[in-house]
């Protein structure tokens, strides 16, 4: 009887873990200093190898920084004392289609664009409190005081 209950439960937990892994839109590659990631009131300490998903905010403290890689190969380097939101992160590796909107609320971010910006530059944008940047280049920096 225990086997009948435990085995399906274990399989369910494994499937949930696989789905959580698939939900990742990117991975933290480097973290220096105090960096947190999350949505709303649910913040966690950022660690190299940790995942990021759509709607996550990356918050860096004074002197801190974070580098993350998205599924399409886009690299984001978030500078010190910054707040960056991954507003829309969609990329289908099969069709090579998607949409990327990054909202820089404070601080600086360097972006090295990936596959999505190369194939569909109109689908990639960086917004700030006062502007919207359409991405046409491959490597640039945006700063918000």
Set out the residue ranges of the language-model regions.
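Absolute protein N-terminus
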Residues: 1, 20-21
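N-terminal signal peptide c-region/cleavage motif recognized by signal peptidases
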Residues: 15-17
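Classic N-terminal secretory signal peptides
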Residues: 8-13
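Bacterial N-terminal signal peptides that target proteins for export
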Residues: 1-7
